[in-house]
Structure formats: C-alpha cells, structure tokens
Amino acid sequence: MNFVVIVSDTFRRDHLGCYGNEWIHTPNLDRLAAESVVFEQARAASFPTVPNRRDVLTGRFTFTYCDWAPLPPDEVVLAEVMGTAGYRTMMILDTPHIVAHGYNFSRGFHGWEWIRGQEHDEWRTSPRDPALPCAPEKLRRPETTVKQYLRNVADRRSEEDYFVARTMIQAMQWLEENLESQPFLLYVDTFDPHEPWDPPQRYVNLYDPGYQGEEVIYPRYAPCDFLSEPELKHVRALYAGEVTLVDTWVGRLLRRIDELGLRDDTAVIFTTDHGFYHGEHGLMGKSIIAEEFSCAVPLYDEVARIPLMIRAPGMKPGHRQAFAQPPDLMPTVLDLSGVRIPDTVQGTSLAPVLRGEEDHVRPLALTSHSIIYGPRAKRFTTITDGEWTLIYPGARFDPSQAAASSIVDSILRIEKATYAGAGGPELYHLPTDPAQRRNVFAEHRDTAARLHAQHVRMLEELGTPEEHLENRRLLAES
C-alpha cells in the first residue's frame, strides 16, 4: 500500500462541509471525506506548528519533554522506518519552519523539495520596502514577517504561483515521475491556510464581495477589538478564501492520484496542526504572542479540534467518534503497511477503527503547549473525554498572566466577560455549551478532578519527566 499524507497548516475543522460548515466551498475535501473514515474527535496534541510535526513524524506526545526545536538525530522517525522496510519516501513542503535553520525534519526521507517563500522565509530581497496593505499596528510583525512575505510574492502572476498550488504541482510531478517507485510514502506539507491571507480575488469574492477597506492579511494575535466589524468580517472572508484555495489544489492532487491509477492501492490522509480564533472568545490568532500575554490563551475547540480523514483501500467510509491525535498517524501508517511499530512510538494505531474492529483507542485526549517550563499559568493543557473539557493551567498560576479580557472592549462580538477564570482551571460541558462560554468548574469540581487525575495518569504512562510533571499533579492550589 502507498501513502500520501497531506498536512495543511491552521485549517479549522469547522470550515469544512464534512464537519458541518454550510457557507464555505470545500467540494474536493468533502468528496474525499465521503470516501474516508472521518474522525469527529480528532484533536491536536503538541501545539503549535513545529511540535505538531514532531508528533506526526515520531509518533510521540512531544509536549511532555520538548518544545519548538529542531529534530534531534537520535529520534526514530517515520520516513526512516518506512525506508528501511523498502518504501520510497519523499517530502514536499512549503512550510519553512521544519526545514529552515537546521530544523532537519526532512531527515530520513530519500528526497525532499522545499517550495520557498512562505511567511517570513528569507528568500527574496526586493522590493526593499514594500507597501503594507493596512495600518502597521493591525499586523503581526509588519516590518519583518509581512514585508518579507510581500517581497516573496512580488512577482506572482497567476494562481499557479501561489504556495499551495506550487506545492501540489510538485507533488503531482513527483507521482508522475515515480510510478515505478512503489510502494511509496509521499508527505506533503503546505503552510496554507496559515497567514498571510491573500488568496486570489475570485476566492475572496465568494465570501465578502465589494469590500473597500484595509486588507489585514496577517492580523496581530491579540484581543480582537483592534478590528472594526467590517474588517473582522473581511478577515474571516480572507481565511475562508484560503480554505477554498487549499481545497482546489488538494483536489487537483487527488484527481492526479486517480488519473495515474494509484487510487486502489494508495491511502490518503488529510489533517492539520491546529485551528485559529477569528473573534471567538474575543481573540484573534491561535495564541497571544506579545510580551505581556505570551501564550496566555487556553486551547479551546476552535484551535484544539482538528480535521482528520483517512481514505484507505478496503476500509468502510463513515464518521467515527474515536479520539485520534497526531502521534497516532505514524503507528497507523506502519500498521496498514505491515511494518513493525518501533517501541519508541507512544501513539496508537487507528487501523482497528478504520477496519471497524474497535470504536475507541483511548478514553481522553490531551492538547497542550509544552509543559517543560515549570509552574507557568501561560502553558495550558486541554483535557477532554468528549463530554467534558477541562482547561488546565498547572497548579500554580499567576492571574496577571491570564487577564487578557480586561483590555477587550464590551461590544457584542466579545463573547466572554472574564478571561481564563482569572487564571485558574476552566470546565465546560460540551453537549450543552459547545462554544465553551460558561465555565462550570466551581459547580462540577468533582468532574474536573476526575479529568485531571486521568490526565496525570496519561502523562505518567507517557514517561513524562517528574520535573515537568510535578507542577501538574495538583488540580489547583487551595
């Protein structure tokens, strides 16, 4: 069996029709979903970009022992294991963070192709001072990230020049040139729909035609009151346009798989690393990246819950309720290919769920910032059993690190009057409060204690070093 693994960065689950969206056009991914096992309870594990890819490629819950860091030479990775078993392995990506500056996530692949220019990739040097599309105070890193990006795309002329298009074109070309290299593992990683958001105008017109204001293509991560209502609507439209752009080009790759006669013996996996807040909880971004509130954002479902669909030969399509997380992808691929799963892997194969043999692989899911920094309130872990979700900051916290709502205005789009329960744990009952707006920790502390205890046991089973686990053994200081 061949494998094509597609990771699309910052892709909100609820922006896909197969997960219930009714206003964004995603016909190709919805078609893939109809032919796949779709995981309703797929959730991120290590957050954000680079930790997620390390989870995927090592099969480990890496937030328990590391953070955003290069891939070390001694960690067992999927490509090496598959290569040793006789697979031809290839990485094609435009996500710069996992290969630039010695990050080395290409290790183990027989070949890799980096499509240059995404985000702040230091690629092009002209124009020296490109004009910003809006007031700089509305942008994240306007003088560095945004201007570098504008240099990188200055000579873009057609849709084929966009990053996701270039990446999928390269993936199609590799398939065409390597038909004799079966079995293969093709890993495709596109940074879209991550910011900056500047899809072709025809995609934007689907969602906000006639807009005349500033183009906030890379909004700063902060409470969202810096945007007017029309700007916030347009930012959402830009992102939706990026989602449809990704759908278009992933669709072309899927069609090429069919045209090359590969479908009957090729598994396709589509997923992401995390989502994004577009005003939910009063926030813009996936976190707050600012000196005074760095990382002080709980990982609510808009960020923590992710799409995951797997189309594999012989598997019955349908929606499944089993928890699935990025560390599960490596053992799943190895299981389906008949390759022994290394002892280093902490994830669980989803193959029994794909075959309809099992309904669940674990009782709960953990989504977390790295926990290696000690007793900081700003390193949240989300613990869920599907009915209840506990947002846990560690036992000792500094309320000043979680007071972001105090600088948010009180207009209707700000959904929470207080933020992060003044820094303490938060508990939500998902069936009655899916938007996670009413913290019921005080009323259901016994439920919170149960989830917390399960989370500690899981961390122990993962071999979390005690120096990182110590601060997480207490639910909260009394």
Where do the language-model regions lie?
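Active-site regions of oxyanion-processing enzymes, predominantly non-cytosolic
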Residues: 1-5, 106-113, 147-152, 156-213, ...
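Catalytic-site neighborhoods of secreted/periplasmic enzymes
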Residues: 53-157
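C-terminal, low-complexity/hydrophilic appendages and adjacent surface loops
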Residues: 301-302, 371-441, 478
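Long, internal low-complexity/basic segments
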Residues: 1, 38, 416-424, 430-435, ...
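Active-site-proximal N-terminal segment of extracellular/periplasmic enzymes that hydrolyze or transfer
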Residues: 1-40, 46, 438-445
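Substrate-binding rim/cap in mid-to-C-terminal beta-strand-loop elements of soluble/periplasmic
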Residues: 56-57, 225-230, 254-255, 259, ...
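Histidine-centered active-site microenvironments of extracellular/periplasmic hydrolases
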Residues: 24, 198-210, 258-319, 325
